[in-house]
């Protein structure tokens, strides 16, 4: 029964052989009744097909049939059980009817199966799905019955289709190959000498059929042992179901017949090749020694430009294209001759070797001439290509040198200078490459006379040599002129770079002075808590002023340098009218601010020194009267210092700036007031004893 004819029925999975076995090694046939609309005719066809698969030996061990009635009515189950006696062989040993949870009337079902017991010929038991393992091992039951056996119906069906297709194709192919091979053995000598035509070709490709068979066999063997990795073993397509030995037997027969068929074809093909080879050899030799050689005799030039070399190369490619067709014939003939020589026919060996030797000599000589000419033209093309590129580079470099450089900024000048150096370096590299290519081309031209076939090519060679040397000399002169112009331009551009660097650094000096001025106003605000600290602050301020002075001097020197460079470059400096006033203005502001800072520090030093002297000394009553004037002087200096803190720094342009923030000034003033209070308190202490003496 052909699977393809009943494929729609088989896809319904009305019954299947899962590959599981009962405890007597009998196959398990499962009938899943999924609905009440199960067609008994289709079920009968499915059972007939499934029971035709196992071998007779397997059938002799009997079947266990599982009828899954959990989703069906009792009447359908009964009909299926009664139908089994007509479809299933007599070796059926047990029919397990899986009953639903809400079972049919026990008396009715028991009576019905007991009534038909003698006529059925096999035992029928009713069992729940979860108790089916009492009769069959769990490893032999599918998952729907609580087992661990894996079964994929569509996969099984697809493999079955492949198996039947292979069996059909291989059987037909064996018959065809047998006819071809036997006919060759019995045919006459004239028939053996005929070439292989369509009458000797099988209807299908033997290689394809063999490949299909090997893939099928590999799949069957893999599935048979697929439990070796620790998974659940499932082999529903083993030798009992798909006749694995049958596949192996068919493959062995196919290999044997196909090997014979290949030998028959080889012998016939070898016998028909000899005459064709002899004819083709003479055709190849005749063309290569005639028209082919004449084409090469007329081609000797290399061209005087890139386009001219391209034209020569294109013409040579046309000649090579014509030769390649004959060389392809030579390769084919050489392979055919080698194959016939390997066959070992003594009567053909001498003639074949002679033909092979003559053909090889002519082809290799012509191929060497073509290769030499191709190499010569390739080197000439590369030489002219390098010369053309170098000429364009020199033109570009010359154009760049002829355009005057307008200064914009130092970065742009640096970039232009870098580009100029790169172009000059590229020209040097190109010229060296031109020399190398030219020397290689000269060496190749010197060897050209060896392929002249007796033709005098000295005139052509002399013209080519003069042209090559002339190109190299011209490029050398052009490169030297550009180098001289580059030296002049480099000097000018370096001066421009130096000019913009000086202007940039001068502007930076202005920024630095602004930063120093800003730091002086915002951070240099402390006057010291005592004379020692004030002295330290005064010394630090002097060093700070030295830094600012050196920055200003540096900026002035840079601006003077820009004037000299501008005179050399004959251009107007942007800094002389812009940066210099800025530099002088910020320096003037810094100087005024610094002087104010020094004045405040000196006042603070005088105040702290006198206050400390008064507070530390302990004069007697006679001297105290003499020092009251010192108390008044210290108090006056302190108040003057407090007044000074509230006065802003006034610049020539009328702008005003304060040291620090109001909170900073308040903090400094508070400390000075504390000192003044201490001095006043000391003065009061000295006055009190004096008054007590007077009263006494």
From Swiss-Prot:
Pfam families: CRAL_TRIO_2, Spectrin_SESTD1. PROSITE patterns: CRAL_TRIO. It comes from the Eukaryota. Keywords: Repeat. InterPro entries: CRAL-TRIO_dom (IPR001251), Spectrin_SESTD1 (IPR056804). May act as the primary docking protein directing membrane turnover and assembly of the transient receptor potential channels trpc4 and trpc5. Binds phospholipids. Belongs to the SOLO family. PANTHER family: SEC14 DOMAIN AND SPECTRIN REPEAT-CONTAINING PROTEIN 1. This is SEC14 domain and spectrin repeat-containing protein 1-A. It comes from Xenopus laevis (African clawed frog).
